[in-house]
């Protein structure tokens, strides 16, 4: 179960009582859209609203929201949870210098910008225990206007802090997952391995061959797949027998119904397996 808060990547139409979305600072995301339901009953993507900055005394309440979400997940039977601190959503917005312009204890230095995300992690650990909690991060990502002046330093700091807490895993998204030329700096993966004692997972634009190579480098323990898994419900088996993959239909992403999510076919039972 993944726990997340989108922060400024939202709109007043989907907020309680039509309130503004919240963020570390009142900066609107660039080119950001969210899925909303319109007055005529239809639904679709819509540009996000300008957020308001969270008051300092509101932040503990959001930490408590995460704690309660973890408690509900546990009662529902989920074995573990992943804290989503990636993809330009709320926790990522606090970590990055371009979206966090605060002057209180939640802004400025590395330690201050990481304070809220780590408070969330601690709250979730209180519910599940550290060995049942992971976190997803996207250092170096540039999305919806989110930028960071010191992404490597923040990634290293977070890795060290999470390692001290005994977190089960750290899940890192490749910065070029949506295209582009941004990559991790030389030596970054090795440094993350040194700083984090739990399992490391990478994801984003991988295929089977590239995933095997990455694991062989000993810089990661696993590679995760998202979009290929949506379009290929039997993805591990396709990898095992070297079968062709179905390409996902991007037009159905965030569509709000089953089309493009649960209607992709499994392999033909007669597929000639390649050993």
What kind of region is each of these model predictions?
Residues 2-275:
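Flavin-dependent oxidoreductase catalytic cores
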């Amino acid at each position: 179960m993944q726990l997340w808060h989108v922060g400024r990547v939202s709109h007043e139409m989907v907020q309680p009582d039509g309130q503004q979305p919240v963020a570390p600072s009142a900066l609107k995301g660039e080119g950001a859209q969210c899925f909303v339901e319109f007055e005529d009953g239809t639904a679709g993507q819509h540009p996000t609203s300008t957020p308001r900055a969270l008051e300092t005394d509101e932040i503990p309440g959001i930490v408590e929201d995460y704690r309660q979400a973890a408690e509900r997940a546990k009662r529902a039977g989920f074995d573990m949870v992943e804290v989503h601190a990636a993809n330009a959503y709320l926790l990522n917005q606090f970590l990055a210098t371009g979206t966090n312009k605060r002057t209180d204890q939640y802004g400025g230095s590395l330690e201050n910008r990481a304070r809220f995300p780590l408070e969330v992690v601690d709250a979730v650990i209180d519910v599940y225990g550290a060995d049942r909690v992971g976190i997803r991060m996207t250092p170096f990502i540039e999305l919806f206007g989110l930028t960071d002046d010191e992404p490597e330093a923040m990634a290293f700091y977070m890795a060290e802090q999470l390692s001290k807490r005994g977190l089960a895993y750290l899940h890192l998204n490749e910065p070029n997952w949506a295209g582009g030329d941004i990559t991790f700096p030389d030596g970054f993966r090795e440094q993350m391995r040194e700083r984090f004692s739990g399992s490391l997972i990478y994801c984003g634009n991988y295929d089977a061959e590239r995933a095997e190579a990455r694991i062989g480098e000993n810089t990661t323990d696993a590679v995760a797949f998202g979009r290929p898994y949506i379009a290929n419900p039997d993805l591990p088996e396709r990898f095992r027998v070297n079968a062709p993959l179905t390409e996902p239909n991007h037009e159905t992403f965030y569509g709000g119904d089953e089309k493009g999510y649960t209607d992709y076919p499994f392999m033909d039972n007669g597929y000639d397996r390649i050993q």
